[in-house]
């Protein structure tokens, strides 16, 4: 760590501790009575239980940076997807671009604002089932929020308990499972109108049926959402070309044969179909894009999991097995560079040139663990896991009439078209068969020296393996045979974790934490690029240091939290782009991220509530970085996908009158950032993002079991740029959805 970084970190730590002391003085003076004698208070803030440490505990007791958005909070703000809520948590930026490739960045740990070429830096889980397969992630899951119990956001590396890809942090979707104690049902319908778009709608339903009371139950969820397009594609002559439809559901079966045994089955199916890409070309106008072909994106996720929880008394045993299948198919317009193919290959292509890209994966995971009962002086956890995946990735370039064009080429001649483009269109393709494995032994122990002081020590011994066999066919190998290459990487290591917490009262906790994270190295699949690229990237790792405090005061009506962190990142995996717009991965250099996260929750009475968070961070290169084909990004350059400042506010007021009218105002601010490291090279045109404010307003009234909500999103119609990418047809900007008004009806049994 550099001396300057030391000084900045120490200043941040002092500020965090000062904030904690300011909150702790009144908390000690007003210590609450024991829980068993305390009278319930409607003004107390909600107590949220999380499983961040793979055991249930209050979010206020976790010696780490954990936030949780409850199912009720998701409903209150009308959240449908990650874009609606994830940035409300400290230290998190959502780089929205296209379904399946939009990317969550935690604490600035990223080298691209999108999910391109390799394993990401944020882990995704559904009820603790990993959704990031080893190596390249086919689809970044964005699970519909209907009937979720909560979404847990773990900031900082989670490699000890959650494995690879959780370098920056993890997101754990917690879905409600079947409840055998009674019948339940819910229905929700939404109609909305977005500027420059058709009318949107959504319909969702849930039913929970106890087959045998307290023994066996089934819960089913179904949803459909149509988000109409708001971009006009002048090349296609289509208004609102970027229509997106999301459909799917979940199924849960829970069997509790006795009080010590629980079997839980959970299935997820979700399909997202986007008719066209969601980036605009600002040089052409406000909400305008221009392509010769529709750039569709189709994604499918299927997951089945079976979980056994067995209470032995002296320990709890958990076995969690899963099977998942993902598929993603894209199309990109390459027509603007058709002229170069015609010139270099003596072709006369006149139809649009396109790239088809995507893949599918099948993954299987198993985790076994023993956990001691909570509340003892020594708590421990021991576990083992295994995850393997088989993937097929493809990249193919084509155009209608390609076979005929090659037959007419002086470089290839008659008869070549049938060999080069057997389907008549695809004339160069690159296929990769990838197998990935991850296995690990992990454990964690917490010892309470006194009721106030606790020490936690943990570690993960892991081994990873990736094998890839790639095949290239088309004009680049003609007249020879297809070119087949194979490569394999094996890596192993150990991730430690140490934390120390001090809880002088029920209302105050201080903690210090050191943890590590890692992710797989990956081979490159940009086989169609005309430029030479590295064969792939090796694994990278980081170390996270943080100090934090959680304080509760004013008899439980106010919570103030502060965290200071410093992340040291080495051998960083870079996500870069060739001059002909293909993404590739390599390793290089060092980086750091340091910052302060502040959050507050205040509920002075049972009518008003204010939730707020402020994050300051600096995620920067720690040394000069040479970028192939681009130049050198100097030390101190900003890391992509991050912002130095983010501010979030949620104010809610419930009027004390008939129908309980409730008014909720939310605000988000995100400072400027860049979308890729190529932008950091002096003289390059920066791909910028961020620097916007968003305001949403909701008004809800309750009529018995039915809530009716009127809402307005992006009230100022801000063109907040969430990601910028250099496309062949111009600089493309992903933007937040334009101003939207609508109404939602929610009925609960």
What does each model-found stretch correspond to?
Residues 119-121, 132-134, 145-150, 155, ...:
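Outer-membrane beta-barrel translocator/receptor signature
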Residues 31, 373, 380-381, 448, ...:
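Gram-negative outer-membrane beta-barrel transporters
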Residues 94, 103-157:
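Periplasmic plug
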Residues 668-678, 700-749:
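C-terminal beta-signal and adjacent terminal beta-strands/loops
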Residues 1-79, 83-88, 208, 259, ...:
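N-terminal Sec signal peptide and the immediately downstream disordered periplasmic leader
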Residues 254-259, 268, 370-373, 385-387, ...:
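Structural signature of Gram-negative outer-membrane beta-barrels, strongest in the C-terminal barrel
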Residues 195-274, 300-305, 361-362, 366, ...:
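Transmembrane beta-barrel wall of Gram-negative outer-membrane proteins
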Residues 204, 307-334, 503, 509-517, ...:
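Membrane-embedded beta-barrel scaffold of Gram-negative outer-membrane proteins
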């Amino acid at each position: 760590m550099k001396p300057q970084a030391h000084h900045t970190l120490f200043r941040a730590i002092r500020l965090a501790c000062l904030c904690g002391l300011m909150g702790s003085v009144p908390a000690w003076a007003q210590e609450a009575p024991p829980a068993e004698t305390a009278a319930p208070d409607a003004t107390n803030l909600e107590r949220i239980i999380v499983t961040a440490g793979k055991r249930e505990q209050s979010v206020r007791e976790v010696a780490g940076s954990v936030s949780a958005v409850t199912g009720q909070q998701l409903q209150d703000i009308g959240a449908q997807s990650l874009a609606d809520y994830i940035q409300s948590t400290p230290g998190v930026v959502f780089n929205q671009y296209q379904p399946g490739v939009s990317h969550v960045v935690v604490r600035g740990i990223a080298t691209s604002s999108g999910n391109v070429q390799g394993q990401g830096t944020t882990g995704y889980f559904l009820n603790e089932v990993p959704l990031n397969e080893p190596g390249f992630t086919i689809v970044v899951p964005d699970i519909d929020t209907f009937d979720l119990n909560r979404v847990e956001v773990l900031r900082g590396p989670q490699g000890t308990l959650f494995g690879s890809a959780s370098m920056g942090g993890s997101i754990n979707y917690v879905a409600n499972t079947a409840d055998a104690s009674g019948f339940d049902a819910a229905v929700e319908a939404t109609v909305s109108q977005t500027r420059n778009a058709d009318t949107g709608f959504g319909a969702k339903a849930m039913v929970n049926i106890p087959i045998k009371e307290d023994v066996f139950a089934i819960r089913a969820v179904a949803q459909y959402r149509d988000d109409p397009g708001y971009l006009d594609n002048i090349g296609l002559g289509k208004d609102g070309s970027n229509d997106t439809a999301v459909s799917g559901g979940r199924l849960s079966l829970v069997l509790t044969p006795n009080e010590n045994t629980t079997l839980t089955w959970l299935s997820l199916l979700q399909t997202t179909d986007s008719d066209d890409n969601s980036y605009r070309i600002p040089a052409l106008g406000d909400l305008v894009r221009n392509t010769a072909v529709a750039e569709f994106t189709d994604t499918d996720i299927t997951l089945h999991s079976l979980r056994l929880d067995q209470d032995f008394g002296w320990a709890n045993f958990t076995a969690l097995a899963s099977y998942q299948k993902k598929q993603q198919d894209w199309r990109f317009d390459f027509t603007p560079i058709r002229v170069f193919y015609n010139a270099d290959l003596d072709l006369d292509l006149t139809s649009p040139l396109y790239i088809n890209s995507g893949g599918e994966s099948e993954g299987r995971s198993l985790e076994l663990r023993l956990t001691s009962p909570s509340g003892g002086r020594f708590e421990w956890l021991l576990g083992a896991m295994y995850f393997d995946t088989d993937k097929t990735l493809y990249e193919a370039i084509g155009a209608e009439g390609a076979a005929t064009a090659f037959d007419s080429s002086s470089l290839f001649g008659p008869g070549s078209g049938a060999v080069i483009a057997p389907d008549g269109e695809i004339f160069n393709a690159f296929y990769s068969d990838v197998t990935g494995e991850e296995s690990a032994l992990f454990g964690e122990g917490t010892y309470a020296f006194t009721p106030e002081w606790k020490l936690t020590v943990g570690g993960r011994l892991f081994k990873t393996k990736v094998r890839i066999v790639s095949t290239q066919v088309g004009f680049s190998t003609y007249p020879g045979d297809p070119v087949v290459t194979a490569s394999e990487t094996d890596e192993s290591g150990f991730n430690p974790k140490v934390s120390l917490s001090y809880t002088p009262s029920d209302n105050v906790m201080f903690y210090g934490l050191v943890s590590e994270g890692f992710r797989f190295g990956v081979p490159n699949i940009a086989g169609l690029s005309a430029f030479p690229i590295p064969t792939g990237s090796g694994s990278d790792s980081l170390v996270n240091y943080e100090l934090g405090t959680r304080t509760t005061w004013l008899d439980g009506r106010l919570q103030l939290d502060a965290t200071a962190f410093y992340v040291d990142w080495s051998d960083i995996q870079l996500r870069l782009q060739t001059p002909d717009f293909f993404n590739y991965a390599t390793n290089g250099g060092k980086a750091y991220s340091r910052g302060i996260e502040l959050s507050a929750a205040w509920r002075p009475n049972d009518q008003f509530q204010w939730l707020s968070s402020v994050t300051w961070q600096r995620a920067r290169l720690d040394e000069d970085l040479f970028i192939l084909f681009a130049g050198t990004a100097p030390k101190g350059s900003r890391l992509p996908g991050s912002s130095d400042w983010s501010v979030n506010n949620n104010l809610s007021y419930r009027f004390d009158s008939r129908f309980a009218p409730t008014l909720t105002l939310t605000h988000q601010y995100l400072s400027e950032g860049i979308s890729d490291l190529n932008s950091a090279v002096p003289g390059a045109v920066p791909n910028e993002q961020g620097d916007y404010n968003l305001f949403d307003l909701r008004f809800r009234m309750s009529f018995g079991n039915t809530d009716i909500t009127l809402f307005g999103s992006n009230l100022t119609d801000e063109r907040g740029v969430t990601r910028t990418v250099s496309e062949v047809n111009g600089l493309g900007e992903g933007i937040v959805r334009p101003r939207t008004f609508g109404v939602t009806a929610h009925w609960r049994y």
